[in-house]
Amino acid sequence: REVEEGSVVVLCGKGNNGGDGWVAADYLAAQGVEVAVVAPVEPSLIRGDAARDAAKRACSVGIPVHVAPDYEELVALLVEADVVVDAVFGTGFHGVMPEPFDMWVEAVDDYFEGMVFSVDVPSGIDATTGQAEGPYFQADTTLTMFALKPGLIAGLGKQAAGQLVVASLVGDDEGSEELADSAR
């Protein structure tokens, strides 16, 4: 769905999937979309050079960053947003979603009424089995890289992923354009 004059909250994890979220935030801001990032740690503490560099780049262009917000602060951001980007966990996730991310899922479930856009796989869903051992994001659209993951077409993943978009990452702006269109 397209949102006129929309705003986006990007929920970023500490690893590579979070790095994808920082890149998405930077891309959206460059397109004139109002965007804010929620992160569990300061950008300098993000794991992986590429993810940390993406976070630093997003911060350098003035994207608002909310580090480890409490529940009320997160809810305040969510009720004003039109789109949430779930870039918390990716294909390597297994098990139960740890704190504070379980609280992020709860806040989105309870207070967010817009579109949820997951990066690679809805966080909380096992990309191999499609199962969840705890809370998970219910996406309207999931942008997955290169190919469908088995967990996106099996178990809870089949329902949690929403509409699936496969991006090649090489000269393929389909996913980026769809995300930007969702926020306009």
Where does each model-flagged region fall?
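YjeF_N-associated NAD(P)HX repair module
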Residues: 81-184
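N-terminal small/polar loop signature for handling phosphorylated ligands or for N-terminal nucleophile
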Residues: 9, 23-101, 105-109
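Small-residue (G/A/S/T)-rich helix-start motifs and N-terminal tracts that mark the onset
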Residues: 1-42, 47, 141, 147-184
